C-alpha cells in the first residue's frame, strides 16, 4: 500500500506512514461477539425492569406494585412458584452474586413477574385472575367516598424513574411560594459567575502568553512541545530548566514541603548499612558477627531501616510540590534517596544472610505500607480519546500500572488496555485506530427519529456490537485479569437515584462481561438508555447479572472511584487522566503542577499574577457554594431523571498526579463525533505531551513499588493462579490450619514451629503431563523460588 493510499495527513505528529494503515492493526477484521451473546443481550433489554412498577398499562390501578406478593398478583401459571419460597430467594441471591445455580420451578423460563436471571422470554401479567380482567369497567353507581378516592387516584400519576417522589419533596407554603423565584435568581447568579470565570481565564492566558512567555524561553517551550518521544522531551526540558535557573533549586536540600534532615539521615544510614552488609557477605563472616551479644548485623540494621522508611509519602518525599518547581526532576537529595531505597531493597532480596521466610515477611509488610498505584481514566464523550496518548506515553516507558479504572468513555479505553498485552497495545495505539471508532456514524435523520421515540440518541444493541471488539469479545473481568495481569475497574450507577454505585472488577463481579459494563458506564441519560449488565455462566452463555437491574453512566456520581480502589486494592497513589469538558474548564493550578512550574519569579509567583489567581479561586469557590445550596434546599429539577449538580459536586476529580490534556475549541463541536486519522493523531500527541512532565514522578514511585512486588513474587511458594492460596495470605492459611488441628484433633496433632518452618521451606512443581510432583527442593540456601 502506497503512502497516498494510506492517506497520511499533512502533519503526522511523528507517526510513521504505517501508523495510518488500518490493515496493520491486530484483529482488525475479527468479530469477537457471538450471535448467541448478542441475542441474550437483546432479550435482557426487552425484559421488564423489576425495580420499577409496571407501566405497560396491563396492571390494575388498584393492584399493588410488582413488589407486593399477594396471591392475586400472579397468573395461574406463576402461582406454583412464589417469591417467598426460600429456595427461590436463595437462587436469585446466588445469581445476583455471580453464581449460576438453577432456580426452582423455572424450567428454563422466567416466572411471570420477571424475576430471575434467565434470558428466556418473560411471561407478562395480563389480568389479576382468569375471571377478573385488569381493565374491566365496573358498571353501577358509586358512593361519595368512592368518587373522591377515584379522583385522588387520577391526580396521583406514576412517577417516572429517577424523578422525585412525594417522599422526597418538601412541603410548606413558603417552600412552594419561593422555590422557583429563588431558583431563578440563584441560577442567574451562577450564569453570571460562569461568564466572569471565562473572562478571568482568558485574562490569565493572555497574561502568560505576552508577559511570562516571550523571547528565548518561548522558543525553548515550543521545542519541548514539538517532541513526540520522551527522551527528546527530557533533553528539551533540561534546556528550559537551565535557562530558567531551576537546576540551582535542585541542589538545595531545604524545602518546606518535606523533611530534608530526616531524608538526609535515612539516606546516609541506608547507604552505610548496605555497603557494610555487602562487605560482610563477600567475606563470609556473617555467622561469626551474628554471635556477638548485644550487637546487630548490618543486614538486620538495613531491614529495620527499610521497614521504617518505605511507606507511602514518607516524610513528604512524594509530595507533588517537590516535582512542581522544575520541568524535569526533583531535589537531588530526594532522587538520591529513591535510588538508595531501590538498591537497599534489591540487597535484601538477593542476600543470603536472611531466610526466605524473613524475606517474605519483610516484603509483605512493606507492600502493605507502601500501597499500589492506579491509572484512572475519566469520562468525557469523544474527549476520552485523549486517554490513548496518556496510555501510550506510559506504555513506552514501561510505567503502565496494573490497576486501571475507567468511567464512561474512559471505560472503553480501559477495556482495550486491560484486555490486550503490551505488544498488542503498541500496535493499536496509532492514528489508524480511528477506523474502529464508528459509534457516531449515523446521520441526523436516523438518530433524531430514535431519540424522539426512545429518548436516546444511540442504540444499545449497535453499541454492544462495536464495544465487543474493544473488550476482546465477551471477556469477563476475571478472564481479562488472567490474560494480561491487569486489574480492570469500571464504575456503574444504578438507574434508580438512591442505590449505591458499584465498581466492577475481578473481585466484586468476576463473571460480569466487560462490554456490558462499558455500555452501562457510558449510558448518559438522553444519549444511551440504561442497560443490563450481563454475566457469563459456566457453560459460556450469557445471562442478565444482578436480577436484570439496569445501570447507567458512572461519571454522573463517581467519576474517579479513589475510595473504592483504596479499600479493595490498597491504592494510595493515583494517576488521573481528566478530560471531562465540564471539569477540564475549571482545572487550574495557580502555583504550578507536577512538571509545569510557574515561570516567573523563579517559581514563587502566581499564574496570571496574584490578582488573576485570586479572582479565579474566588469565582470557582462561589460557584461550588451556590450549587451546594441549590442541591441541599432541593430546588434543582431532575431533567431526564438525573441530579446534574453531581457532575461538579463529587468528592474528587483529581489524584496524586492529575493529567489534563490540552484541548481546542473544535473538540466541543465534535464532542459526539468520530475522529478521523488526523484528529486522532493530534489527540494522541497532546495526550503524550501532557503525560511527559509527570513521568519522572511516576517513575520514582513505580520503581519502588515494582521492586516490592518482585520481592513478594520471588519469596512466595509456587501457587496455582485461581486457587485459595492466591486469595488468602500464607499467615492466614497457617492460622486456619492450626485452628482446625486444635479443634478436631489432640494436642500432639498440632504442627510445631520447627515442622512449620520445614514445611515453608519446601516447594514443588506440578508437571503438566502427569499431574504429579516433579520434585522437592530445600530453600535454606536462599536460591530463587520456582515460578
Curated annotation (Swiss-Prot):
The record's EC number reads 3.1.1.-
Alphabetical GO biological process terms: lipid catabolic process; triglyceride metabolic process
Keywords of this protein's UniProt record, alphabetized? Hydrolase, Lipid degradation, Lipid metabolism, Membrane, Transmembrane, Transmembrane helix
Give positions of region: Disordered.
47-69, 137-164, 745-787
Report the coiled-coil segments: none
Q: Which top EC class is given?
A: hydrolase
Q: Where is the composition biased (Low complexity)?
A: 59-69
- Cross-referenced Gene3D superfamilies: Cytosolic phospholipase A2 catalytic domain
- What family name appears in the similarity comment? Belongs to the PLPL family.
- Entry annotation: catalytic residues: 408, 553
Write out the biased-composition intervals (Polar residues). 777-787
Q: Ranges of Acidic residues compositional bias?
A: 746-759
**What do the Gene Ontology cellular component annotations say?**
membrane
Tell me the organism's taxonomic lineage: Eukaryota, Fungi, Dikarya, Ascomycota, Pezizomycotina
| Subcellular location, record wording | Membrane
- Read off the PROSITE patterns from this record: PNPLA
> What InterPro entries would the database entry show?
Acyl_Trfase/lysoPLipase (IPR016035), NTE (IPR050301), PNPLA_dom (IPR002641), Triacylglycerol_lipase_N (IPR021771)
For this UniProt entry, the molecular function terms from Gene Ontology, in alphabetical order, are: triacylglycerol lipase activity
Question: What task does this protein carry out?
Answer: Probable lipid hydrolase.
CDD domains, alphabetized: Pat_PLPL (cd07232)
In terms of PANTHER family, this protein maps to: NEUROPATHY TARGET ESTERASE/SWISS CHEESE D.MELANOGASTER, TRIACYLGLYCEROL LIPASE PTL2
PNPLA domain residues: 375-566
Taken from the record, one Pfam family name reads DUF3336
Question: What is the protein named?
Answer: Patatin-like phospholipase domain-containing protein MGG_12849
Q: Where does the UniProt entry say this protein principally localizes?
A: membrane
Q: Ranges of Basic residues compositional bias?
A: 144-157
Topology of the protein relative to the lipid bilayer: Single-pass membrane protein
Amino acid at each position: 500500500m502506497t503512502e497516498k493510499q494510506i492517506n497520511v495527513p499533512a502533519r503526522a505528529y511523528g507517526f510513521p506512514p504505517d501508523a495510518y494503515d488500518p490493515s496493520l492493526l491486530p484483529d482488525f477484521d475479527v468479530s469477537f461477539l457471538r450471535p448467541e451473546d448478542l441475542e441474550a443481550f437483546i432479550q435482557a433489554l426487552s425484559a421488564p425492569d423489576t425495580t420499577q412498577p409496571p407501566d405497560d398499562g396491563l396492571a390494575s390501578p388498584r393492584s399493588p406494585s410488582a413488589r407486593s406478593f399477594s396471591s392475586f398478583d400472579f397468573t395461574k401459571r406463576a402461582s406454583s412458584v412464589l417469591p417467598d419460597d426460600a429456595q427461590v430467594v436463595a437462587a436469585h441471591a446466588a445469581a445476583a452474586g455471580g453464581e449460576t445455580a438453577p432456580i426452582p420451578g423455572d424450567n428454563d423460563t422466567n416466572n411471570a413477574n420477571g424475576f430471575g436471571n434467565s434470558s428466556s422470554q418473560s411471561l407478562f401479567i395480563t389480568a389479576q385472575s382468569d375471571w377478573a380482567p385488569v381493565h374491566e369497567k365496573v358498571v353501577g353507581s358509586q358512593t361519595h367516598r368512592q368518587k373522591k378516592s377515584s379522583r385522588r387516584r387520577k391526580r396521583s400519576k406514576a412517577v417516572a424513574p429517577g424523578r422525585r417522589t412525594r417522599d422526597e419533596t418538601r412541603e410548606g407554603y413558603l417552600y412552594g411560594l419561593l422555590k422557583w423565584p429563588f431558583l431563578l435568581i440563584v441560577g442567574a447568579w451562577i450564569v453570571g459567575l460562569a461568564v466572569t470565570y471565562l473572562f478571568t481565564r482568558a485574562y490569565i492566558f493572555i497574561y502568560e502568553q505576552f508577559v511570562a512567555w516571550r523571547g528565548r524561553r518561548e522558543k525553548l517551550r515550543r521545542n519541548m512541545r514539538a517532541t513526540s518521544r520522551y527522551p527528546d522531551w527530557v533533553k528539551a526540558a533540561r534546556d528550559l530548566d537551565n535557562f530558567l535557573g531551576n537546576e540551582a533549586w535542585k541542589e538545595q536540600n531545604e524545602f518546606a514541603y518535606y523533611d530534608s534532615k530526616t531524608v538526609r539521615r535515612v539516606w546516609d544510614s541506608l547507604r552505610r548499612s548496605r555497603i557494610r552488609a555487602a562487605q560482610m557477605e563477600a567475606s563470609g563472616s556473617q555467622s561469626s558477627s551474628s554471635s556477638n551479644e548485644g550487637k546487630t548485623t548490618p543486614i538486620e540494621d538495613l531491614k529495620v531501616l527499610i521497614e521504617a522508611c518505605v511507606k507511602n509519602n514518607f516524610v513528604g518525599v512524594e509530595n507533588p510540590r517537590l516535582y512542581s518547581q522544575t520541568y524535569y526532576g526533583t531535589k537531588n537529595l530526594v532522587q538520591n534517596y529513591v535510588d538508595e531505597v531501590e538498591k537497599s531493597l534489591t540487597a535484601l532480596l538477593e542476600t543470603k544472610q536472611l531466610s526466605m521466610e524473613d524475606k517474605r515477611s519483610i516484603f509483605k509488610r512493606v507492600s502493605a505500607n507502601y500501597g499500589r498505584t492506579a491509572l484512572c481514566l475519566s469520562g468525557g464523550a469523544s474527549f476520552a480519546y485523549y486517554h490513548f496518548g496518556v496510555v501510550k506515553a506510559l506504555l513506552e516507558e514501561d510505567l503502565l500500572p496494573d490497576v486501571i479504572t475507567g468511567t464512561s468513555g474512559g471505560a472503553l479505553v480501559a477495556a482495550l488496555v486491560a484486555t490486550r498485552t503490551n505488544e498488542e497495545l503498541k500496535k493499536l495505539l496509532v492514528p489508524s485506530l480511528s477506523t474502529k471508532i464508528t459509534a457516531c456514524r449515523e446521520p441526523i435523520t436516523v438518530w433524531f427519529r430514535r431519540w424522539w421515540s426512545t429518548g436516546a440518541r444511540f442504540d444499545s444493541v449497535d453499541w454492544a456490537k462495536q464495544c465487543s471488539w474493544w473488550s476482546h469479545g465477551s471477556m469477563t473481568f476475571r478472564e481479562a485479569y488472567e490474560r494480561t495481569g491487569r486489574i480492570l475497574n469500571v464504575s456503574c450507577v444504578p438507574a434508580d437515584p438512591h442505590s449505591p454505585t458499584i465498581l466492577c472488577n475481578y473481585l466484586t463481579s468476576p463473571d460480569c462481561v466487560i462490554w456490558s459494563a462499558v455500555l452501562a458506564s457510558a449510558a448518559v441519560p438522553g444519549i444511551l438508555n440504561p442497560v443490563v449488565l450481563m454475566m457469563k455462566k459456566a457453560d459460556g452463555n450469557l445471562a442478565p447479572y444482578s436480577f436484570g437491574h439496569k445501570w447507567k453512566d458512572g461519571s454522573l456520581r463517581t467519576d474517579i472511584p479513589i475510595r473504592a480502589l483504596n479499600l479493595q486494592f490498597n491504592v494510595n497513589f493515583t494517576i488521573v487522566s481528566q478530560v471531562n469538558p465540564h471539569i477540564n474548564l475549571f482545572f487550574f493550578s495557580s502555583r504550578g503542577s507536577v512538571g509545569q512550574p510557574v515561570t516567573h519569579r523563579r517559581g514563587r509567583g502566581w499564574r496570571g499574577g496574584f490578582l488573576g489567581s485570586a479572582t479565579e479561586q474566588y469565582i470557582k469557590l462561589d460557584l461550588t457554594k451556590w450549587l451546594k445550596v441549590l442541591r441541599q434546599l432541593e430546588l434543582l429539577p431532575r431533567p431526564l431523571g438525573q441530579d446534574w449538580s453531581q457532575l461538579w459536586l463529587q468528592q474528587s476529580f483529581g489524584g496524586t498526579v492529575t493529567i489534563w490534556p490540552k484541548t481546542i475549541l473544535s473538540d466541543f463541536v465534535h464532542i459526539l463525533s468520530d475522529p478521523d486519522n488526523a484528529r486522532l493523531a493530534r489527540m494522541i500527541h497532546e495526550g503524550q505531551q501532557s503525560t511527559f512532565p509527570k513521568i519522572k514522578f511516576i517513575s520514582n514511585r513505580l520503581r519502588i513499588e515494582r521492586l516490592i512486588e518482585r520481592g513478594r513474587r520471588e519469596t512466595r511458594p509456587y501457587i496455582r493462579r485461581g486457587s485459595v492460596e492466591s486469595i488468602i495470605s500464607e499467615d492466614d492459611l497457617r492460622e486456619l490450619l492450626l485452628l482446625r488441628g486444635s479443634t478436631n484433633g489432640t494436642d500432639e496433632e498440632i504442627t510445631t514451629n520447627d515442622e512449620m518452618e520445614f514445611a515453608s521451606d519446601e516447594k514443588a512443581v506440578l508437571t503438566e503431563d502427569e499431574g504429579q510432583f516433579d520434585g522437592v527442593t530445600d530453600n535454606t540456601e536462599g536460591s530463587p523460588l520456582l515460578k
